[in-house]
Amino acid sequence: MDTETVSPNFDDIRPLNNSEVKDAIEKLVANEDFERALRYIKPNLNWEEFSVAMRACKTKEEFKSTLAYDAVMTVAKNTTFSLTISGRSRLPKDKAACTFISNHRDIVLDASFLNVMLYDVGYGMTQVAIGDNLLIRPWIETLVRLNNSFIVKRGVSVRQMLEVSKTLSAYIHHAIKNVNESVWIAQREGRAKDSDDRTPVSYTHLRAH
């Protein structure tokens, strides 16, 4: 589902609209750093064929379910024994949107593995929260927003923090209630490098707003 009716107040954090997909793909196809990153995952990648496949994607959904899905499964094949999912009986029977909260051990794979497994069982992929501290290059922001991620602003002052938190909470509510897309958020800010997966109280406040 598209986010064309999103309030302008969310423009700096929301995923791309489908009307923005074509321009985003052209920027990525022309970016040498993006090409190098993909070749790291798939060394034998035929860039010309991949560029054609990229340009064939007219919506975020097409991009996610084909190229992004394939990239994640390539990583899974090369780095894991298997991917499994449990707890399917707890998913909403009517496929209604909801919030997924999980521990956070990898920058992108926690949510990526969840999304491909949800897709495989016929449940929609989630919008993914990603910290702006990871968007170290413009092409990375373009890619994650094309892949239906929304931005969590981290480097803000104490004075700005409350307003940023309210806006983020309002966006999550909008995505679930109005766009009918589930969201994924990590249960803490940053990865749990010390294996401490406890959820900060502030995250429960975020959901309550």
What residue spans do the PLM features occupy?
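Conserved small/polar residues in nucleotide/adenosyl-binding loops
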Residues: 204-209
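Catalytic-site beta-strand/loop segments enriched in glycine and acidic/polar residues
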Residues: 175-203
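A structural signal for well-ordered alpha-helical scaffolds and beta->alpha junctions
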Residues: 65-69, 165, 200
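Glycine- and small hydrophobic-enriched segments that form the cores of compact globular domains
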Residues: 87-183
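Charge-dense, low-complexity intrinsically disordered segments
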Residues: 58, 62, 155-162, 194
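Membrane-anchoring hydrophobic helices of lipid-metabolizing enzymes
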Residues: 1-98, 104-115, 119, 141, ...
